[in-house]
Design a protein with these regions (language model features):
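Extended acidic/polar, glycine-enriched regions
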Residues: 1-53
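Solvent-exposed loop and edge beta-strand segments that line ligand/cofactor-binding
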Residues: 3, 69-82, 123-135
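Low-complexity, Ser/Thr/Pro/Gly-enriched N-terminal "stalk/linker" regions
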Residues: 8, 39-76, 80, 100-108
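Structural helix-adjacent loops and short alpha-helical linkers that scaffold large soluble proteins
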Residues: 18-28, 51, 93-106, 113
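Active-site-adjacent bridging/hinge elements
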Residues: 28-34, 57-67, 108-119, 138
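Extended ligand-binding clefts on enzyme/binding-domain cores
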Residues: 76-96
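Helix-terminus loop motifs that line ligand-binding clefts
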Residues: 97-143
Length: 143
């Protein structure tokens, strides 16, 4: 069994196996779904089925982009960018009422402040990056 230390995100899986002419039987394949355990407490109703599908995709995305922190995407960087985090925090609060990740994000970003008050654009991260307007998003989150 292969189980990575950190989760891997995928939609499709291609397995290339060379058997050198020997028969191959895959007895079992499984994967585990991982997402932050936000509960959907808000209700979205519409007589347009397409809008309900958009709601479902958006809510699934919100859950997939949250784990120990909020992050920009579950596939690539997995970094908590302030610009994305503010939107994700509002979605979490409005739909679930769960404020744990919101409070965590506010504290994380507070810890990222430089001496002049600007926050890093993404935190926690080993590589400091500053996008000045993102500091204002953090101020808006605290307000």
């Amino acid at each position: 069994m292969f189980r990575p230390v950190w989760f891997r995100t995928w939609r499709y899986l291609q397995i290339d196996i060379e058997t050198n002419g020997e028969p191959l039987q895959i007895n079992r394949f499984s994967s585990e779904f991982t997402a932050y355990p936000l509960k959907e407490n808000a209700i979205f109703e519409s007589d347009q089925s397409g809008l309900k599908k958009i709601w479902n995709v958006g809510w699934r995305t919100a859950r997939l982009c949250a784990n120990e922190t909020y992050f920009d995407c579950p596939y690539y960087e997995q970094l908590q960018y302030v610009g994305d985090t503010r939107i994700q925090a509002l979605v979490s609060l409005y739909v679930s009422g769960d404020d744990r990740l919101v409070r965590n994000a506010i504290m994380n970003l507070s810890e990222s402040q430089f001496y002049e008050g600007l926050t890093r654009s993404r935190y926690p991260s080993a590589n400091p990056q500053i996008i000045p307007p993102f500091s204002l998003y953090w101020v808006d989150m605290v307000n």
